[in-house]
């Protein structure tokens, strides 16, 4: 696809997206999103909500999902650098409990598509980071669920051993402790 490189991740549906950059003496230009190109590349549409978060060094946000209205997310970094993680938590999935992570940064312009039904989180590697993400479903606070960032059964190798956590993220349960009705199903 012209102007867009899409690399399948190790987990089904996870995609690493590398938009083409057009540099010149003034700086550079890149398309951060183009509905037609992204749809043709296999990234589900439509996106119905855009979010951004600003976080300081070593802040870890996650792992988050929605159960009945799962969100696919297209994640990219406008400022700074993060280690971004997707975890398959879909009941019945052959890759249930498996994860993959990628460094996303303002310098590399890489994006990560995290499919609906996956948990998502990131930790900030730079002094601060501005992370933006497009969602395929609207946020519903009554539908949210989280998984412990350091769940030993998942075994994510975070590059920051002692992250800064928000109050809610600090007390999230392990995946094995969630009843089936608090997990997304394999669609």
Each language-model region and where it sits:
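Non-catalytic, conserved peripheral segments adjacent to functional cores
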Residues: 1-110, 126-128, 135-187
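Short alpha-helical functional segments enriched in proximate histidine and acidic residues
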Residues: 121
């Amino acid at each position: 696809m012209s102007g867009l490189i899409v690399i399948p991740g190790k987990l089904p549906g996870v995609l690493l997206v590398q938009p083409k950059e057009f540099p010149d003496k003034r700086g550079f230009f890149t398309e951060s999103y183009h509905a037609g190109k992204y749809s043709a590349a296999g990234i589900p549409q439509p996106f119905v909500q855009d979010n951004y978060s600003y976080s300081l060094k070593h802040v870890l946000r996650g792992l988050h999902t929605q159960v009945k209205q799962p969100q696919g997310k297209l994640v990219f970094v406008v400022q700074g650098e993060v280690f971004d993680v997707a975890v398959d938590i879909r009941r019945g999935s052959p890759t249930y409990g498996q994860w993959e992570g990628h460094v996303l940064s303002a310098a590399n312009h890489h994006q990560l598509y995290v499919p609906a039904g996956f948990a998502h989180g990131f930790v900030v590697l730079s002094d601060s980071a501005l992370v933006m993400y497009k969602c395929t479903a609207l946020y519903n606070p009554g539908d949210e669920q989280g998984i412990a960032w350091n769940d030993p059964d998942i075994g994510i190798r975070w590059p920051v051993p002692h992250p800064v956590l928000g109050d809610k993220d600090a007390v999230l349960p392990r995946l094995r402790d969630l009843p089936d009705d608090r997990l997304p199903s394999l669609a």
